[in-house]
Amino acid sequence: MKAIKKEFNKKAPLLEEKVVKINRITKVVKGGARFRFSALVVVGDKKGQIGFATAKAKEIVEAIKKALEKAKKQLVRIPITGTTIPHDTIGRFGASKFFLKPASKGTGIVAGGKAARTILELVGINDVLTKTFGSRTSINVIRAVMDGLQSLRTKEEVAKLRGITLAKKEQ
C-alpha cells in the first residue's frame, strides 16, 4: 500500500496550497464547550489545475491536512488563454453570483475578497476583472468561482461543439 502511495505522489504535479479560512465550531454540552475546527483550502498548479475542499477535525492541523488531501483528489482543469480567461462568464452557487471578465496583460487580478483572489492566483489567471454579487461567504464565493471557471470553453471547443472549423491565421 505504501509503494502505491509513493508512486502516486511522484506523478502528482507540484501543487501550491493555501488555507482560505479556518473556523472554530463550538458545541455546548453539559460539561462545558467542545471545540472543533473546519478548514477551507485551495490547491492549484498555476497552470490550469485547481481544487478546493473543506474538512473538520478536533485540531487545526488535522483539519487542514484532511482538507488538503480531499482538495488534491478533486482537481479540475480550467482553460486559460495566456494570462487571462477566454471569455466573460458568470458563476452561481446558492445566493452568490460571481462575474469574471478577461483583462489585458498587466491588469492583474481585480477581485474583492481573499477567497476569489486565492483561487484565481492558484489556477494561474493573472489578468482578470471580477465582481461578486449576493452572498460573500468564503465557501459560497469559491463554489461560484469554480462554477464560472468550469463553464469556460476555448475557441476550439466551441467550434467543435458547433461543428465548424476555425480559419488558421496566416503569418
Curated annotation (Swiss-Prot):
The keyword Cell inner membrane does not apply. Residues 15-78 form the S5 DRBM domain. PANTHER family: MITOCHONDRIAL RIBOSOMAL PROTEIN S5. One of its GO terms (biological process) is translation. One of its GO terms (cellular component) is small ribosomal subunit. With S4 and S12 plays an important role in translational accuracy. Located at the back of the 30S subunit body where it stabilizes the conformation of the head with respect to the body. Gene3D superfamilies: 3.30.160.20, 3.30.230.10. The keyword Ribosomal protein applies. The N-terminal domain interacts with the head of the 30S subunit; the C-terminal domain interacts with the body and contacts protein S4. The interaction surface between S4 and S5 is involved in control of translational fidelity. Part of the 30S ribosomal subunit. Contacts proteins S4 and S8. Belongs to the universal ribosomal protein uS5 family. Keywords: Ribonucleoprotein, Ribosomal protein, RNA-binding, rRNA-binding. PROSITE patterns: RIBOSOMAL_S5, S5_DSRBD. This is Small ribosomal subunit protein uS5.
